[in-house]
Amino acid sequence: MARDIQLPCDGDGVCMRCKSNPPPEESLTCGTCVTPWHVSCLSSPPKTLASTLQWHCPDCSGEIDPLPVSGGATGFESAGSDLVAAIRAIEADESLSTEEKAKMRQRLLSGKGVEEDDEEEKRKKKGKGKNPNLDVLSALGDNLMCSFCMQLPERPVTKPCGHNACLKCFEKWMGQGKRTCGKCRSIIPEKMAKNPRINSSLVAAIRLAKVSKSAAATTSKVFHFISNQDRPDKAFTTERAKKTGKANAASGKIYVTIPPDHFGPIPAENDPVRNQGLLVGESWEDRLECRQWGAHFPHVAGIAGQSTYGAQSVALSGGYKDDEDHGEWFLYTGSGGRDLSGNKRTNKEQSFDQKFEKSNAALKLSCKLGYPVRVVRSHKEKRSAYAPEEGVRYDGVYRIEKCWRKVGVQGSFKVCRYLFVRCDNEPAPWTSDENGDRPRPIPNIPELNMATDLFERKETPSWDFDEGEGCWKWMKPPPASKKSVNVLAPEERKNLRKAIKAAHSNTMRARLLKEFKCQICQQVLTLPVTTPCAHNFCKACLEAKFAGKTLVRERSTGGRTLRSRKNVLNCPCCPTDISDFLQNPQVNREVAEVIEKLKTQEEDTAELEDEDEGECSGTTPEEDSEQPKKRIKLDTDATVSATIR
């Protein structure tokens, strides 16, 4: 007697028994294996409509008796029934979510047991945290692949079905006249086939991941740190120096305890070595030695200052021909206006106008507020009668009274000019006076007749002469320092670098998640969908945006029914009509898996940090449970900002 064999529908929806393509209302999907079957070809179709909701196909229900086979195949028969029983057990487990059931079914069908999968999960967890930057790239590479070349997409294009492809692969596929997805055979709209749009969110995410990998792959730079206490007494060079002399020298020990942004004279309390402070007339061999005593910290630049804080000191070293030195007052030229690109560090030709910015702005701010500015003169200033014969000399503090701009001696470009007037309690090195300066009238400057952008101080200066005490002093509180005096110890710097490195990896994941942001709710995507115009939205947000809107509009007039008109539903981010896409928006499962993996890595990193903190603090589990835990929590509505503690 001939055996009646029942067969399901194939991948194209064609019944494998009658070779016809049944309509959807004549097809049934198995609740276990999700395989479509032709109802007319079933030997025992469901009796009622309710029974179709949880219908099981003949293969899964075991209604068909197995074909007579040899005894050697009994193992396969028992294995098949065991597989069906295991799938039914998974479906009956109400504690599992739909996603977890799907994963467990996939494990069983792939021949991998639950125990093997658990061991693999343990191995993954054990290896987590070793290289977080590479984990970020693997999260993309494992889940986000081109459906044609199976590589990380280059210029990714997201199709309406939710699958991604390289732009080049997509255009090649479309050029062959194929209008279906290469993975799921879904129809691709004609408009997208002619004008595909690159998914900018995926581009930014892939770029960030590649940058993090390249940064992790490069050899970390070695920092040679020497604390101030361990530095030699004079500037020194090491075997790493490329040039002889002091061209590559490092600074010696700093002897004064002032911050780099200290204004005014250096008193005795800031000189623990000699207990006398910085005296007018002190000389040093070079600028590096001058730096060690705090007179002028930069060993190359002529201006020490900050544009929003003020200038602390200047050096007269003959850098500009415009400078005029008259001892108790001098005209100083600002910095800039020269092309120093490449190896033109000593270029003396003006190329453009100087402006009141950067160091020049710092001098102007000191002029406005009346701050004292320390002045050192170098033997390189050959045009001045007040320059030392050798080395560098400290000449006291000056105050900037005016500043302006004028065309320089080269005759083409403007330079910034400053009038410095001496205001120190100690006599100048070139005088035989026993007392310091007294307030003197501002000298006549002929070049002011041709000056532009002239600025004169209107308010009372912070550093001024007190007639009652007969000395120069701070009439207003000096500005608070913004820089620390003591440099971090090597161990503290090491811990800080570790914290910065850990924060970088956390920030990289946070930045990646920020790229996967819904354009409507501005939160991390949940069930992401990508429109044909390459904009990403949460599926719920997009559906809620167009809730209550129909695809067609019925029209009538005067009792007559007119032809229905299609409603134009524009994308929330651009004028593109996405009404066809909204009929059945497909979730981009690849992007969803990437987001889920990044969130999991974020949570695992937080757990590892908690464990490390517990080990460092030496607390017991009972004590640790009583203490508040520090966690880096990733919400779906915002990304994590890394914090260094």
From Swiss-Prot:
The record, for SUPFAM superfamilies, names: FYVE/PHD zinc finger, PUA domain-like, RING/U-box
Q: Where is this region: Disordered?
A: 96-133, 599-645
Report the domain of life of the source organism: Eukaryota
Enzyme Commission code: 2.3.2.27
Q: Where is the composition biased (Basic and acidic residues)?
A: 626-636
Q: What function does the entry list?
A: E3 ubiquitin-protein ligase. Participates in CpG methylation-dependent transcriptional regulation and epigenetic transcriptional silencing. Mediates ubiquitination with the E2 ubiquitin-conjugating enzyme UBC11. Promotes methylation-mediated gene silencing leading, for example, to early flowering. Associates with methylated DNA, and can bind to CpG, CpNpG, and CpNpN DNA motifs, with a strong preference for methylated forms, and with highest affinity for CpG substrate. Probably acts at the DNA methylation?histone interface to maintain centromeric heterochromatin.
**Subunit structure, as described in the record:** Interacts with histones CENH3, HTB2, HTR3 and H4.
Q: What happens when the gene is disrupted?
A: Centromere DNA hypomethylation and centromeric heterochromatin decondensation in interphase. Decreased DNA methylation primarily at CpG sites in genic regions, as well as repeated sequences in heterochromatic regions. Released transcriptional silencing at heterochromatin regions. Ectopic CpHpH methylation in the 5S rRNA genes against a background of CpG hypomethylation.
Q: Do you know which CDD domains this protein is assigned to?
A: RING-HC_ORTHRUS_rpt1, RING-HC_ORTHRUS_rpt2
* One of the GO biological process terms: negative regulation of gene expression via chromosomal CpG island methylation
Tissue expression profile of the protein: Mostly expressed in inflorescence and, to a lower extent, in leaves.
Q: Which GO terms describe its cellular component?
A: chromocenter; nucleus
Q: Which residues form a coiled coil?
A: 583-613
Which reaction does this enzyme catalyse, per its entry? S-ubiquitinyl-[E2 ubiquitin-conjugating enzyme]-L-cysteine + [acceptor protein]-L-lysine = [E2 ubiquitin-conjugating enzyme]-L-cysteine + N(6)-ubiquitinyl-[acceptor protein]-L-lysine
Pathway field of the UniProt record reads: Protein modification; protein ubiquitination
User: Can you name one GO molecular function term for this protein?
Assistant: methyl-CpG binding
Q: Record's domain comment?
A: The RING fingers are required for ubiquitin ligase activity. The YDG domain mediates the interaction with histone H3.
What the entry lists under SMART domains is as follows: PHD, RING, SRA
Miscellaneous comment text of the record? ORTH2 is missing in cv. Bor-4 that exhibit a centromere repeat hypomethylation phenotype.
Write out the biased-composition intervals (Acidic residues): 603-625
List the PHD-type zinc finger ranges: 12-63
The protein, known as: E3 ubiquitin-protein ligase ORTHRUS 2
Give compartment(s). Answer: Nucleus
Q: Which organism is it from?
A: Arabidopsis thaliana
Q: Which gene encodes it?
A: ORTH2
